[in-house]
Swiss-Prot record:
Location of the active site: 285 (proton acceptor)
Originating gene: ubiB
Membrane topology: Single-pass membrane protein
Name of the protein: Probable protein kinase UbiB
Gene Ontology molecular function, alphabetical: ATP binding; protein kinase activity
Pathway named in the protein's UniProt entry: Cofactor biosynthesis; ubiquinone biosynthesis [regulation]
Pfam (any one): ABC1
Transmembrane segments: 501-521
Organism lineage string: Bacteria, Pseudomonadati, Pseudomonadota, Betaproteobacteria, Burkholderiales
Family: Belongs to the ABC1 family. UbiB subfamily.
Species of origin: Burkholderia mallei (strain ATCC 23344)
UniProt binding sites for ATP: 124-132, 150
């Protein structure tokens, strides 16, 4: 079976002239000669990027998905290829509704007419992984509730595993034969896609993502997220609250309904930066197909988020990296940008900060020929990542995913309001983050988090130091790396504790002095 699939892939490559694209990048002389023979006498009207998109479409939904994921790696691909792959649509004909009903009944352990008052047999949406039916719940406290039922396609795993095995083989050969193979790391890209695809095959994971996002925005008048019904959800079936709205792309319809379009554009950016800098958890598939706007009088003009299969998570370190880079960029402090890359630990130790600074200046300085409101933060990140790649900087996958999402959000915002000033909207979030991290509040919050661990580990520090000294005396060259790392970790924790105690003590002391002055002023001593 795999051999036939492989033959089809080879013929597709030749049919769309992708061997011509490969020819210029292949190093092996024999393979290069073979490719020259296959390209004799052929002419193609479409550019290579378009031919790649069409080839992936002809190979089926799994390769379409791969192209979509590949389009997010703008740090690896030329701009024209990334833009063309972003046009790939994950739309396939629906599977038989009788099969969908059978999957629901098997997964939930009851007949469809016992579970639902109504179940629309014609799906409202169909993609490569699942399709969606509208229904109404029949039982319990949610009786009569309108829901959307997402059903996983049957027998997907064998197809996916077969195609992934071929992709791994192709990636291995590409890494050996292609001039850019090592730099582009095709095996890592396929491994990333493997994880992403298998995550999508578990609808409980998507439900958990949606539930987290809903909880994060509870009480904020910004974003509506459907409620997940856990009693009706399994890895193969997801039942969530049905929400209806107007697709964000239908701007004329929204304007005619009375929606404030410039406000909508600003709030879209606010939602994104709230997810990034407050929550460290963001919806990473915010294209127009997954975003609607409510016209319900109760929630008029609010965003509705759908499809939670792809999310990103950021650590405090990631958020600090982003905030400081953006602030340094807009101050044109390229030395600081270069230093931040070195401090991240993702740069080879022999990298010269002056060379990195010069390269960053060369790609960033041209942005300042335009107004601040016209600068794309996503493009800035993309250029920084591309420059970093030349210095063998290992850009973290979550930051690449964030950059792709940021481009989507910017495109969405500017399609609504071409005058949208992204920097004006983003700057307060960046400055608030830095204030909270560096200021007294940040120290206090970190002290609360770390205090229990410190109280447990601090008493062990003298023993660890003693052990290290004894070991060094008995075998000067035999101190284990693990022990050294452990000592350094404890030392850093101790330093943080002492710093926090110092700040806390200064704050208490300052408070006491101020209180004393107020008493003197009020009562005359």
């Amino acid at each position: 079976m795999r051999i036939f699939r492989f033959v089809k892939i080879v013929f597709t490559v030749i049919r769309f002239g992708l061997d011509e694209v490969m020819l210029s990048r292949i190093e092996n002389p024999r393979v290069k000669l073979l490719l020259r023979i296959t390209t004799i006498g052929r002419r193609f009207a479409d550019p290579p990027a378009v031919r790649l998109r069409r080839a992936l479409e002809s190979l089926g939904p799994i390769f379409v998905k791969f192209g979509q994921v590949l389009s997010t790696r703008r740090d690896l691909l030329p701009v024209d290829f990334a833009n063309e792959l972003a046009k790939l649509q994950d739309q396939v004909p629906p599977f038989d509704s009788a099969v969908a009903i059978a999957i629901v009944e098997k997964s939930l352990g009851a007949r469809i007419d016992v579970l639902f008052d109504e179940f629309e047999r014609v799906p409202v949406a169909s993609a490569s992984i699942a399709q969606v039916h509208f229904a109404k719940l029949k039982q319990g406290e949610h009786k009569g509730k309108a829901v959307a039922v997402k059903v996983l396609r049957p027998n997907m795993l064998p197809v996916i595993d077969s195609d992934l095995a071929l992709m791994r083989d192709i990636a291995t050969w590409a890494e050996r034969l292609w001039a850019d193979g090592r730099r582009l790391k095709p095996r890592e890209v396929v491994a990333e896609f493997d994880k992403y695809l298998h995550d999508e095959l578990d609808l409980m994971r998507e439900a958990a993502n949606g539930s987290q996002l809903r909880r994060n925005f509870a009480g904020l008048d910004l974003l509506l997220v459907p409620e997940m019904f856990w009693d009706y959800s399994t890895p193969a079936v997801l039942v969530m609250e049905r929400m209806t709205g107007v697709p964000i792309s239908q701007v004329d319809t929204l304007r005619a309904a009375g929606v404030d379009i410039p406000k909508l554009a600003r709030e879209g950016v606010e939602i994104f930066f709230t997810q990034v800098f407050r929550d460290g958890f963001f919806h990473a598939d915010m294209h127009p197909g997954n975003i609607q706007v409510s016209l319900d009088p109760k929630h008029f003009g609010r965003y509705i988020a759908l499809d939670f299969g792809i999310v990103g998570a950021l650590s405090d370190f990631d958020k600090n990296y982003l905030a400081q880079n953006f602030l340094a960029f807009f101050k044109r402090d390229y030395h600081r940008v270069a230093t931040l890359h070195l401090e991240s630990g993702w740069v080879p130790p022999d990298t010269r900060v002056e060379e990195l600074e010069s390269a960053i200046r060369a790609v960033c300085e041209p942005y300042f020929d335009r107004a601040l409101k016209d600068i794309s933060l996503g493009q800035v990140l993309m250029r920084l990542f591309s420059t970093s790649r030349r210095f063998n900087v290992e850009i973290q996958p979550q930051l690449v995913l964030l950059q792709k999402t940021m481009l989507n959000v910017e495109g969405l915002g500017r399609s609504l309001d071409p005058e949208l000033d992204l920097w004006k909207t983003a700057k307060p979030y960046l400055e608030r983050w830095m204030t909270e991290q560096i200021g007294l509040r940040g120290w206090y919050e970190r002290f609360k988090v770390e205090a229990p661990q410190w109280s447990k580990t601090l008493p062990q520090l003298p023993r660890l130091v003693h052990q290290a000294l004894i070991s060094h005396h008995e075998a000067p060259r035999a101190i284990s790396d693990d022990l050294i790392r452990q000592i350094l970790v404890e030392q850093r924790r101790t330093n943080r504790l002492l710093q926090a105690l110092l700040v806390f003590g200064l704050a208490v002391g300052a408070g006491a002095v101020i209180a004393r002055v107020l008493i003197v002023l009020a009562y005359g001593g």
